[in-house]
A protein has these predicted regions:
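Intrinsic-disorder/low-complexity, polar/charged segments enriched in Ser/Thr/Lys/Arg/Asp/Glu/Gln
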Residues: 7-9, 18-20, 89-91, 100, ...
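Active-site/ligand-binding surface loops and adjacent short beta/alpha elements
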Residues: 32-34, 41-108
Length: 164
C-alpha cells in the first residue's frame, strides 16, 4: 500500500544505437510524497569472463553483505552473483569482448546511483540507475520529496557501441 495518489510516465525513444528514457513522476496528492525510483535493464552477455567494466568507482557497497568493498575485487566475483551499489559519475559502462560491444548507461544526478547485479547461471548483467539507496524512506539518505501537485523528471539512456 502506497498512500499517495501519483502518476508515473515513462517515455521511451529509440534512436540509432540508443534507447532514451524520460521519466516523470507527478504527485497528485495533497501532501509531499517521498520517492525512491530505479530502472532494471538487463543485458545479455556472452560470458562473465568476457566482461570489462570501465571507470567504475573505487569502492562500492556489497548489498548482500552490507559492507563497503573494492569495486574491482567485487566485480571479479560477478560470475558468482553480485549485488553492488555505487555512487557513480552518472555513467556505468561495460564491454563484452566476445559480443564486441560496449554498453553505456547514462544516468545523471539524481539518478546517478548505480547497481550492478548478476544472477548466474543466467548469462546476463543488470545495470540499474537509482535515485536513492535502499531504506532511504527510513534513514532519509538522498530521499527525494515531491511537493503536493508537483512533479519530478529523471532522464537516462542506454547506448550500444560496436567494438569492431
Amino acid at each position: 500500500y502506497y498512500p499517495f495518489n501519483f502518476e508515473l510516465r515513462i517515455e521511451v525513444s529509440l534512436k540509432s544505437n540508443c534507447l532514451e528514457f524520460e521519466i516523470s513522476i507527478y504527485n497528485k496528492s495533497d501532501f509531499p510524497m517521498p520517492i525512491n525510483f530505479g530502472l532494471h535493464p538487463y543485458f545479455n552477455i556472452s560470458d562473465f569472463k568476457n566482461l570489462e567494466f570501465i571507470n567504475s568507482p573505487l569502492n562500492c557497497l556489497n548489498q548482500e553483505k552490507n559492507i563497503i568493498s573494492n569495486t574491482l575485487d567485487e566485480l571479479n566475483n560477478i560470475n558468482l552473483g553480485v549485488d553492488l551499489l555505487m555512487y557513480t559519475s552518472g555513467r556505468s559502462i561495460f564491454r563484452d569482448k566476445v559480443f564486441k560491444r560496449q554498453v553505456s548507461l547514462i544516468h545523471p544526478y539524481p539518478f546517478d546511483i548505480g547497481v550492478i547485479w548478476s544472477d548466474p547461471p543466467r548469462r546476463m548483467v543488470c545495470l540499474e540507475p537509482w535515485t536513492s539507496p535502499r531504506n532511504s524512506f527510513v534513514d532519509g539518505l538522498r530521499n527525494i520529496m515531491i511537493p503536493s501537485k508537483d512533479s519530478r523528471r529523471f532522464d537516462a539512456s542506454i547506448q550500444i557501441k560496436s567494438l569492431n
